[in-house]
Amino acid sequence: MSTYSLSPARRAELNQKSNWRGTLEVAKDWALVIAGFAISLAWPHPLSYVLSVFLLASAMAGFAILQHETAHRSLFATPSLNEWVGEYLAALPILQSMPSYRAYHMTHHRLAGTPDDPDRIMTESYPVSPGSLKRKIWRDISGQTGIKSIIGLMGMYAGYWKYELTGKVERLMPAPQGVSGYAKKFIGNNGHIAILWQFAIWGALYALGNGWLYGLWAIAFIFVLPTCMRIRQIADHAVVADPLSKNPLMHART
């Protein structure tokens, strides 16, 4: 396996944080959301709806990437922008929680290249048989993965389950006490804002006389996004040179 190193000047350039570039990245993803809906608003046709779904799923994947960058505090030079934008403009619209993701993801980085890496369960079985891969993709495109994700994320907001991205189910202990305890936890984790984001998107479309187009957003989230994220995970961590190496060049591709 060949490796190369970046010059100090190039490395400094790549590590430079920028508020305006971070703002541009966020604006581009939201522009993609607007474009996704605008196409179907302007040209109502089955082909337009299909294109809209894929554009919206692309934007959602972009929000997941923005959540990742803000979790690393690398998108903006101003720390408070990483916190606020990462949570309210990237994570919550796709039912995620940036603080919870950050805690989980930092554990992944700390343990990457070891058997204890929480993400390892998603790719350690690769390469899999064609039949196994087909079954995994079918679970994604049939909506099974997406629906389970929604249920899981709501439970994580409420403090019922521990935050996970692998499909692993683990009760969070100590558990909240009673319905009011779960409700307080849900609100404390901004679960209500994640729900309000869904109503806001529907409300904007309803005001334009096409509230039903929110269904395209739901379809993108439930049926397309899980497939995109699975392929991305496989590309990044499956069948790498040495999954148990502490060298990032050996246990990951990107």
PLM features per residue range, with description:
Residues A31, T70-A71, V239:
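Active-site His/Glu-centered metal-binding helix of metallohydrolases
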Residues A57-Q67, S97-P99, I147-S149, W217-P243:
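Transmembrane alpha-helical segments that form the membrane-embedded catalytic/substrate-channel core
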Residues R73, A77, S100-A103, G211, ...:
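Juxtamembrane/interfacial segments flanking transmembrane helices
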